């Protein structure tokens, strides 16, 4: 009896031990499965920079002329054939970029500032950012024609430094941005509309296009201008790094005109220009070639998508969804990101 009892006890002990082992392994497998199914946590984007160039294309990067932009391309998503608009001029193209509308809808076909025409009636991405999430925008422009788009609102700040002022240069516009950020972080605002760091910064950098049109697209002067534009992009990104914002910032780069095309004169051919469109930074797939058709009109909706915002307004801008690492996650309601 004693032997039988001990054998029974041993068998029962082994059975219990086996069940516990199975349960523990099941828990490990479940935990591993759960870990595999949960995507890598990606910090939300709180700031977006949009660099708007002129006279820029894929060939502009050859010879190491633009190392900062080359790095953004390598670390981000790109298409070199985003469609622009007709007429292929600075003001109509910029109007389409910020309204997310084709020229036939926003109606701006001219290329100089005409006070009598007033501001465009169409809402802009700046309006949608405010309405959808209370996000502010700061816009730095380098051509007086773009005054046409500078409709004053409590959630936008515009600064202009165009060719009519001889002292204006790419370096000068960067210094304005640095001053703006210094005032924003001083605790005193800047005497303008926004009293905090802007959530959306637009930087217009047309120097390369102007130099290419006047001195030749194969000239040394054009390559030097590309280098200055690249240096400006690097300097603006340095400002964000100094403010500790790099890990919360996404950058976009596009151009109002391709290399070889003057944004002041419409080309003789009827083709719609193709321009670069680049996204890089927080939440963007690295080293990714965009497959879907992209239009510069899509920039506004993609910026909003990046910030976790949506608009149900009918406009022609569509988010370029394939560039993102994770599915859309709405920004917290009522958040005040700085």
Pin down the residues of each PLM region.
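Bacterial N-terminal signal peptides
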Residues: 13-25
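A long, amphipathic alpha-helix that forms part
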Residues: 42-44, 174-175, 181-185, 209-249
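Metal-dependent active-site segment of extracytoplasmic phospho-/sulfohydrolases and closely related
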Residues: 49-50, 68, 229-267, 303
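Structural recognition of the beta-strand scaffold that forms the well-ordered cores
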Residues: 49-52, 79-81, 96-98, 136-141, ...
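Short, structured active-site-proximal loop/turn typified by the sulfatase FGly-forming signature C/S-X-P-X-R
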Residues: 59-94, 101
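Substrate-binding rim/cap in mid-to-C-terminal beta-strand-loop elements of soluble/periplasmic
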Residues: 94-98, 267-310
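His/Asp/Glu-rich, glycine-adjacent segments
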Residues: 101-216
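Polar, surface-exposed loop/tail segments
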Residues: 294, 309-338
């Amino acid at each position: 009896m004693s032997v039988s009892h001990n054998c029974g006890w041993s068998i029962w002990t082994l059975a219990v031990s086996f069940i516990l082992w199975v349960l523990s392994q099941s828990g490990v497998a479940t935990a591993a499965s759960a870990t595999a199914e949960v995507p890598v946590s990606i910090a939300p984007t709180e700031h977006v920079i949009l660099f708007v160039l002129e006279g820029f294309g894929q060939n502009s990067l050859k010879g190491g002329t633009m190392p900062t932009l080359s790095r953004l391309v390598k670390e981000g998503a790109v298409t070199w054939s985003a469609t622009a608009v007709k007429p292929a001029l600075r003001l109509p193209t910029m109007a389409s970029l910020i309204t997310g509308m084709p020229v036939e809808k926003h109606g701006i076909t001219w290329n100089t500032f005409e006070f009598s025409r007033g501001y465009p009636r169409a809402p802009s991405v700046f309006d949608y950012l405010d309405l959808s999430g209370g996000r502010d925008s700061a816009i730095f422009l380098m051509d007086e024609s773009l005054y046409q788009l500078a409709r004053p609102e409590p959630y936008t700040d515009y600064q202009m430094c165009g060719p009519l002022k001889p002292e204006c240069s790419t370096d000068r516009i960067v210094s304005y941005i640095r001053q703006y950020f210094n005032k924003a972080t001083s605790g005193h605002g800047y005497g303008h509309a926004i009293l905090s760091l802007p959530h959306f910064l637009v930087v217009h950098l047309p120097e390369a296009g102007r130099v290419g049109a006047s001195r030749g697209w194969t000239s040394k002067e054009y390559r030097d201008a590309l280098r200055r534009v690249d240096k400006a992009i690097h300097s603006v990104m340095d400002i964000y790094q100094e403010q500790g914002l790099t890990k919360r910032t996404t950058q976009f780069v596009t151009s109002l005109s391709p290399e070889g095309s003057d944004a002041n004169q419409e080309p003789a051919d009827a083709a719609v220009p193709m321009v670069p469109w680049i996204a890089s930074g927080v939440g963007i797939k690295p080293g990714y070639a965009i497959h879907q058709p992209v239009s510069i009109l899509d920039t506004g909706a993609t910026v909003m998508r990046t910030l976790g915002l949506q608009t149900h307004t009918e406009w022609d801008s569509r988010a370029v969804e394939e560039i993102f690492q994770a599915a859309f996650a709405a920004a917290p309601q009522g958040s005040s990101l700085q």
